[in-house]
């Protein structure tokens, strides 16, 4: 099993253009959905160039091609906007590393889907907030992400997990799960169940506004947590939104 995993990893490393000979690979980060690795490439000056390699969880994201088309579209748009505003697109948004065949992701011989990004240097990714300012900076980064993408043609994005944001559908599934009560735990959370049912109408508000045209379709991140923002190591300022 270990030999097969090493063979697949080597197959993946050979597929991407990391800009040199790979010197090492280590598991990286504390993500729960995708498997993340840091790839080290030795450079002529002795420094090690780093890249991020991820195996996409295709049980969660069953359309990796659509997912990566979304990410490439959004990040390339962000690069243009950031540059126009005098920013540094190499640090302020993700940069997709393409395969040697020019593709945005690679499918290995077992069907696994892989993607790679440039490593954003001189940043920190916090798992736990230490100061109110850090929370502010993470919120600022997500707000800036939304602002920069305000004019992005959101209708061109693929819905990679169908009805994931459809709160009316979520409520229907809640009622089905409640009726099935497969673990027999509903009796322990009657107050919470009552609260949700009392607010059933709220579940339709955003979807109704969207369908009526009163709420414009926009790009959203939808996993706006502290460890999905890179902070500048020197200034502590919110720099780059990740895990798109």
Predicted regions located by residue number:
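Juxta-kinase regulatory segment immediately upstream of eukaryotic protein kinase catalytic domains
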Residues: 1-26, 74, 78
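ATP-dependent phospho-/nucleotidyl transfer catalytic cores
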Residues: 1-3, 19, 26-30, 54-65, ...
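ATP-binding glycine-rich phosphate-binding loop
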Residues: 18-44
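Active-site beta-strand-loop-beta-strand hairpin of nuclease catalytic cores
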Residues: 40-50, 235-238
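ATP-binding pocket architecture of kinase catalytic cores
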Residues: 44-72, 76-156
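Hydrophobic HxD+1 residue recognition
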Residues: 224
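Catalytic-loop signature of eukaryotic-like protein kinases
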Residues: 227-230
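Conserved active-site aspartate in kinases
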Residues: 243
């Amino acid at each position: 099993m270990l030999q097969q995993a090493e063979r697949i990893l080597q197959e993946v490393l050979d597929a991407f253009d990391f800009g040199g000979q790979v010197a090492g690979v280590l598991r990286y980060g504390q993500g729960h959905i995708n498997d993340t690795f840091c790839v080290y490439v030795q450079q002529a000056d002795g420094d090690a160039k780093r890249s991020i390699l991820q195996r996409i969880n295709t049980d969660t994201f069953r359309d990796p091609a659509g997912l990566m088309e979304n990410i490439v579209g959004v990040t390339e748009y962000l690069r243009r906007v950031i540059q126009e505003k005098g920013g540094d697109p190499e640090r302020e948004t993700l940069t997709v590393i393409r395969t040697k065949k020019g593709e945005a992701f690679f499918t290995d011989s077992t069907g696994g889907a892989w993607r790679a990004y440039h490593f954003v240097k001189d940043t920190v990714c916090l798992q736990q907030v230490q100061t109110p300012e850090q929370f502010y900076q993470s919120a600022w980064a997500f707000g800036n992400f939304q602002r920069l993408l305000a004019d992005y043609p959101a209708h061109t994005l693929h819905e990679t997990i169908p009805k994931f944001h459809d709160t009316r559908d979520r409520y229907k599934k809640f009622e089905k799960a409640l009726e099935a009560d497969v673990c027999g735990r509903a009796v322990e959370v009657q107050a919470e169940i009552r609260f949700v049912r009392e607010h059933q109408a709220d579940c339709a508000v955003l979807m109704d506004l969207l369908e009526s045209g009163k709420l414009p379709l926009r790009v959203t991140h939808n996993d706006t947590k502290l460890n999905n923002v890179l902070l500048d190591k020197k200034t502590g300022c919110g720099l780059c939104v990740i895990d798109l």
